[in-house]
């Protein structure tokens, strides 16, 4: 599904070069639940931005569904981002004073294809917010806002969900509710790529990629995956 070969990333600002990623080699298969883990400044968010087609490598090759990303035109890249990828971020990125329903509908508003309005209600129900569909975003708790963000990422039925520190602004119990939603989506076939600095959050994944100083230091599949407590699951 995804393959990176000898990927490097650096930024140049006022002739100052900052090297962020070094010699990244990575394969991600369809249906995996992966946690990318590391301290602040380790390069994990930059790696996610490259994987999610929000940024490009300085050097190296990136293949998405066997297509070389570096040779894609801007229109094709945009289509991949809109149809095959869903994003969830730490700060929710919701429109203020706008209803849950309208926030979730937003990606469909920009779609060039024929849309099915029922997909909005389906996505809202999938994250347990059917009873909040008409609430404004500023009337919601932090956990509810993150659920809206997940519903919005689902509305185009993407193959992959990228979640960058989705529990970072939440208390531990609410964070585990978000983890339970991501786990449920993975159980239903979605590929989940989660960026986190929290070990307990990473342990709900099936594979943990550890990073430090821009390098992958460990890629672990042989561990006991933490189970979601039924008391934290959405009803």
Residue ranges and their predicted role:
Residues 2-24, 28-205:
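ABC family nucleotide-binding domain
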Residues 28, 212-213:
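A short hydrophobic/aromatic micro-motif that marks alpha-helical segments and, especially, helix-coil
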Residues 42-44, 212, 235:
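Serine/proline-rich low-complexity intrinsically disordered segments, especially terminal tails, linkers
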Residues 73, 212, 220:
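Residues at the C-termini of beta-strands that transition into short coil/loop
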Residues 208-210:
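Conserved short hydrophobic beta-strand within the ABC ATPase nucleotide-binding domain
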Residues 215-235:
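Conserved beta-strand-loop-alpha-helix hinge in the C-terminal portion
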């Amino acid at each position: 599904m995804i393959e990176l070969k000898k990927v490097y990333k650096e930024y140049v600002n006022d002739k100052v070069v900052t090297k962020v990623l070094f010699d990244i080699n990575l394969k991600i298969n369809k249906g995996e639940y992966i946690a990318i883990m590391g301290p602040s400044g380790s390069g994990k968010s930059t790696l996610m931005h490259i994987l999610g087609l929000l940024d490009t490598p300085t050097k190296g090759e990136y293949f998405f569904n066997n297509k070389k990303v570096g040779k894609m035109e801007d229109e094709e890249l945009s289509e991949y981002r809109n149809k095959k990828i869903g994003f969830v971020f730490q700060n929710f990125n919701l429109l203020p004073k706008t209803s849950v329903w309208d926030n979730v509908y937003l990606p469909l508003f920009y779609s060039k294809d024929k849309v099915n309005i029922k997909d909005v209600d389906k996505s809202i129900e999938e994250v347990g917010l059917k009873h909040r569909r008409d609430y404004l975003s500023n009337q919601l708790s932090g956990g509810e806002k993150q659920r809206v963000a997940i519903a919005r990422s689902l509305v185009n039925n993407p193959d992959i969900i990228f979640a960058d520190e989705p529990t970072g602004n939440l208390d531990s119990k609410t964070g585990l509710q978000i983890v339970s939603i991501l786990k449920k989506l993975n159980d239903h076939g979605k590929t989940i790529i989660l960026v986190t600095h929290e070990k307990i959050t990473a342990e709900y994944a099936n594979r943990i990629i550890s990073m430090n100083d821009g390098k992958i230091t460990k890629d672990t599949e042989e561990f006991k995956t933490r189970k979601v407590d039924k008391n934290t699951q959405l009803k």
